[in-house]
Amino acid sequence: MRQLTVAAVQMRMVDDVSANVATADRLVREAAARGARLILIPELFEGLYFCTDQLAEHFDRARPLAGHPTITFFSSLA
């Protein structure tokens, strides 16, 4: 049996995508430096959690997977 170190990142999100990505980046790197090989970050970490109601004002937060800059960034980090 192989051992796998897992980390679950807990972070406070703000309404600033760049700041949230930078925080997640720092915490992922910290977890990896501590030996984690599987690192989980919060869903919808790019911004404030907005899924309490289905409000049209939040629909523009959705972005396609293809070419998504955050997905590309964390894929390269992996």
Q: What residues fall within each predicted segment?
A:
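A broad, low-specificity signal for short, low-complexity segments enriched in glycine/proline
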Residues: 1-3, 47-48
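Cys-nucleophile CN-hydrolase/nitrilase-fold catalytic domain and related Cys-dependent amidase chemistry
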Residues: 17, 26-78
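Active-site-proximal beta-strand elements of phosphoester/diester hydrolases
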Residues: 3-15
